[in-house]
Amino acid sequence: MERTRRDAGLSTANPRSFYGARPDTSISIRLLNVVRRGLRRTNSSVLGAISRRLYIRATQRRGKHLGEQQRVLLSLLQPHDPLKREKSLPAIDLVVPFVEKDLRSLELVLQQALRNVRNPISRIVLITPQNSENTGPRFIREESHQILADIISSRSNIVLRHDQDVLGPEILAELENRFGRGDRNAGWVTQQLIKLSAALASEAPASLILDADTLLLSKKTWLNSSGRQLLQLANEYHTDFMKHTLKHFGVPKELKMSFVTHHQLMQTDVVRRMFPEGGASLVAWWQSSTDAIGRDLGDYEVYGAFLAHHYPTRVAHGSFANLFSPHLTTFLADRERTGWSPERLIPGYCSVSFHSWAQVDRADRGD
């Protein structure tokens, strides 16, 4: 592999060194990479369960969550595909909210999801803001309309919906009351509400919600026929999300790990139990926020915590193994030049996220 990468003109170091946000030079990071490669071959649910019990005991003794390196290790100790042996898998929806800047890689995002999701995909639901004339997507560049049209025409099961249609009247009224029209502060809470609203409205047993800046790199089974699902453990830790989840739903957190993983399966019956009155329940969840613009609301965190607390037998914990990359331009250029798949360019990871706000290229940030 090293010789092949060199022949292709690519770095022979770990992908974290040349696509990641931080240099891969420390001994601890190098050890984690060795562990990562070994654990992917084991896919052991037993090892994952033992490590979670040890982590819970450690946090109970300490009285708080552990540090980032310990959380990363715990996530890596989980199986990457704990439901791999399952057969007769139920079909699910794939839901991808996006904006114009995401069109550059949206086709690749869909390709990677279809390649690596083992469950059949019944529908691909693309969700984007509508323009002020209510005539189509809110795009600035004329060529963006053709790019989207080509994506939609390439697959028969794609459905295009607009934010306003997904959110519904109760949420739209609350947005108008709080922010008026065009307030950028509405962006964060709108994202949370769109994903949960889409999951609520799904006719499938579950929806895989996928951020439009995230590529899936590893085959995974998301849901089995008895309703048991993959729930990945993240490296991040968001205290505000957890405090609000405890406040609104009364859900404590024994396993002090995050579920903010940039993509997550949401089962329809679980989301409907969380928000039994649909849009009105979502508004109540928002109104219980202690932050003026809802920055303590976390869609992935609240669903994961609720599921783990109320339906523990329906949870199969898995490894996140995500690479956070500020180098979308470099990645796309390398892929174009070599013809390699994303999995080959970024081996050893389950997904990679190119968050626009972190990109080193201003054009990729949407500036």
Where are these regions (language model features)?
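Conserved donor-nucleotide/metal-binding helix-loop-beta segment in metal-dependent transferases, i.e.
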Residues: 217-246
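Short aromatic/hydrophobic "clamp" motif used to bind/position activated sugar donors
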Residues: 207
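Active-site-proximal specificity loops/subdomain of glycosyltransferases
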Residues: 144-197
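Catalytic core and acceptor-binding pocket of nucleotide-sugar-dependent glycosyltransferases
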Residues: 257-340
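A conserved hydrophobic helix/loop-capping motif in glycosyltransferases and polysaccharide synthases
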Residues: 93-101
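Short, acidic, metal-binding catalytic loop of nucleotide-sugar glycosyltransferases
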Residues: 112-121
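Membrane-proximal basic amphipathic "stem/tether" segments
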Residues: 2-90, 352-355, 360-367
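Short beta-strand/loop segment that forms part of the nucleotide-sugar
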Residues: 121-131, 161-164
